[in-house]
Amino acid sequence: MPKRILVGTVVSDKTDKTVVVKVERKVKHPLYGKIIRRSKKYHAHDEANAFKTGETVRIEETAPISKLKTWKVIDRVQAGKGTAIEADV
């Protein structure tokens, strides 16, 4: 069976070697037919602590690393929008 690969946004990078990735999907409401956004958070392994909050990343399913971590970050899809810029004042 192939490994699942998902794309999501890093919402937390506070723990060591771990990031929390929020993956959104769109589903159709069974009765009303409206398209609704559903989301789920995954704990993913980040060996080098390279990924920061706000970045869009690709995660891959792996064998369990810890109680919560069964995903690892493969690569960065898009840089975060909240990057700090230094200014001379």
UniProtKB/Swiss-Prot annotation:
Keywords: Ribonucleoprotein, Ribosomal protein, RNA-binding, rRNA-binding. InterPro entries: NA-bd_OB-fold, Ribosomal_uS17, Ribosomal_uS17_bact/chlr. One of its GO terms (molecular function) is rRNA binding. One of its GO terms (biological process) is translation. The keyword Transmembrane helix does not apply. One of its GO terms (cellular component) is cytosolic small ribosomal subunit. It holds the Pfam family Ribosomal_S17. The keyword Aminoacyl-tRNA synthetase does not apply. Belongs to the universal ribosomal protein uS17 family. One of the primary rRNA binding proteins, it binds specifically to the 5'-end of 16S ribosomal RNA. HAMAP family: Ribosomal_uS17_B. Part of the 30S ribosomal subunit. NCBIfam families: PRK05610.1, uS17_bact. This is Small ribosomal subunit protein uS17. It comes from Novosphingobium aromaticivorans (strain ATCC 700278 / DSM 12444 / CCUG 56034 / CIP 105152 / NBRC 16084 / F199).
